[in-house]
From Swiss-Prot:
DNA bind region: 230-289
Lineage: Eukaryota, Metazoa, Chordata, Craniata, Vertebrata
Molecular function terms, GO-annotated: DNA-binding transcription factor activity, RNA polymerase II-specific; RNA polymerase II cis-regulatory region sequence-specific DNA binding
Cross-link (Glycyl lysine isopeptide (Lys-Gly) (interchain with G-Cter in SUMO)): K123
Keywords, comma-separated and alphabetical: Cytoplasm, Developmental protein, DNA-binding, Homeobox, Isopeptide bond, Nucleus, Phosphoprotein, Transcription, Transcription regulation, Ubl conjugation
Organism from which the protein derives: Bos taurus
Family label: Belongs to the POU transcription factor family. Class-5 subfamily.
Disordered, as annotated region: 1-48, 86-137, 287-322
Protein's name according to its UniProt entry: POU domain, class 5, transcription factor 1
Length: 360
């Protein structure tokens, strides 16, 4: 870089120089790197108007320093109304209008603004934000249709004598999926979401058709209701019967099938009820015995704290040990800080006899 600049200085006059000497360059030519690096301040000595006008003449900011040169070329951002510096030198200045137009066209064609949004983008956003009137009309029509069908379903159900739970069970018989009474109630009250209403509508429509055409649907629904009730049946035993079962369990915790049938006949219960009760009672006894054994093991292990025995806090005053242990002793309190002299408990006289006695 230094060699190039030295060679340029040898053939280029310094700023403010004449350049008319022998062997000097022509008055209309100057090296761009030398011109960039030797621009004078405004009002000072610089390149004369006969050679090339400087940046101060045009009112432009100074170009970057020489170390920003890339490949021997000085880079300046294209300015509107100013012609670019040709790489070989400046031969003739271009008019401002033509130069400005050329720069604008080159800048627009070479480096378009990447941040500029396309012209059609706002239109697309507006189209997305604005709802389609046809779709809104279709949704409103579907909502009205669902409202009318919900009213029809409720009227048909009440007329045929079905409950909401019966409708759910019948759907399970017809389509293999049982719906709860809450779901049917929310459908009739239009409390389900629009999506769930649309999913449930075809199934209920088929139920309405089957209810009109199939006379045995009521019987099928009753049979399914009995099956579901048997599955969910919860047995309740009276206290008197439970007491008799408890006494029999103490005598024989695991009765045979004959004994179970005999007990069921005596108490007026079903065999399965008696059998299940004895099974549950044995499991309960196992759990209680395991809990008791765990508690005994914990007590036998003792305190988890290491060290000597931990004394329990007792009432203040002297406490005596067992006879023959070594005389009376005092139970250690939790606090190791001695009492003040003014608050010491009154001393109690102790008579050493065969057995410890409290003094009056």
């Amino acid at each position: 870089m230094a060699g190039h600049l030295a060679s340029d200085f040898a053939f280029s006059p310094p700023p403010g120089g004449g350049g008319d000497g022998p062997g000097g360059p022509e008055p209309g030519w100057v090296d761009p790197r030398t011109w960039m690096s030797f621009q004078g301040p405004p009002g000072g000595s610089g390149i004369g108007p006969g050679v090339v006008p400087g940046a101060e003449v045009w009112g432009l900011p100074p170009c970057p320093p020489p170390y920003d040169l890339c490949g021997g070329m000085a880079y300046c951002a294209p300015q509107v109304g100013v012609g670019p510096v040709p790489p070989g030198g400046l031969e003739t200045p271009q008019p401002e209008g033509e130069a400005g137009a050329g720069v604008e066209s080159n800048s627009e064609g070479a480096s378009p603004d990447p941040c500029a949004a396309p012209a059609g983008a706002p239109k697309l956003d507006k189209e997305k934000l604005e709802p389609n009137p046809e779709e809104s009309q279709d949704i409103k029509a579907l909502q009205k249709d669902l409202e009318q069908f919900a009213k029809l379903l409720k009227q048909k159900r009440i007329t045929l004598g079905y409950t909401q739970a019966d409708v759910g069970l019948t759907l399970g018989v017809l389509f293999g999926k049982v719906f709860s009474q809450t779901t049917i109630c929310r459908f009739e009250a239009l409390q389900l979401s629009f999506k769930n209403m649309c999913k449930l509508r075809p199934l209920l429509q088929k139920w309405v058709e089957e209810a009109d055409n199939n006379e045995n649907l009521q019987e099928i629904c009753k049979a399914e209701t009995l099956v579901q009730a048997r599955k969910r049946k919860r047995t309740s035993i009276e206290n008197r019967v439970r007491g008799n079962l408890e006494s029999m369990f103490l005598q024989c915790p695991k009765p045979t099938l004959q004994q179970i049938s005999h007990i069921a006949q005596q108490l007026g219960l079903e065999k399965d009820v008696v059998r299940v009760w004895f099974c549950n009672r044995r499991q309960k006894g196992k759990r209680s015995s395991s809990d008791y054994s765990q508690r005994e093991d914990f007590e036998a292990a003792g305190s988890p704290f290491t060290g000597g025995p931990v004394s329990s806090p007792l009432a203040p005053g002297p406490h005596f040990g067992t006879p023959g242990y070594g005389g009376p002793h005092f139970t250690t309190l939790y606090s190791s800080v001695p009492f003040p002299e003014g608050e010491v408990f009154p001393s109690v006289s102790v008579t050493a006899l065969g057995s410890p006695m409290h003094a009056n």
